[in-house]
Amino acid sequence: MSVHSGSRQLLIHGLMLVLVGLVWGLVVPNTPYPRLALGAHIQFVTNGMLFIALATLLLAVPHRVGRTSVRVMLLAVWLTWAMALSEVANAWWGTTLMLPLAAAQAGPTGGAAWQELIVKLAHIGAGLGLIVAWSLLVVGFVKRAPDQG
């Protein structure tokens, strides 16, 4: 996989995250915990825009981001999908441990232990993945691009 093809994959993921978020927005009022469903909608759209921006930078601006870094970024986008989908499930589960502020507003009593674990692991993985991906992006742009000597 080249940096260019990986960047296109990131762009497609970003576009799909936004699309899924927009469609999911139609479902939000029909879930047991609409406030938690709204959180999933926001995660899809916001993270989709984040990956669109990341991919656009990689495709349009000179940089020194390598193939390995792009692979890490692709892992981060897959972890982001897992996190956003865990929030979709949470609109029915009503877990409270990982997102206590949203849960306090939504009023759930908590999910089963396995549900709480899925939501927790998905959020931790995506959070760490996003931090690493953006750190690699920053480093790749701070280094001088090959044509800038």
Language-model region placement:
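Membrane-interface interhelical loops and short amphipathic "cap" helices
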Residues: 26-42, 98-114
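Hydrophobic cores of alpha-helical transmembrane segments in multi-pass integral membrane proteins
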Residues: 10-27, 38-58, 74-90, 124-139
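Individual transmembrane alpha-helices with interfacial aromatic-anchor signatures
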Residues: 109-130
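Eukaryotic low-complexity, intrinsically disordered regulatory segments enriched in serine, proline
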Residues: 87-107, 120-124
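N-proximal short alpha-helices
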Residues: 9, 16-18, 54, 104-111, ...
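Juxtamembrane membrane-water interface segments of multi-pass membrane proteins
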Residues: 1-9, 27-36, 53-74, 90-99, ...
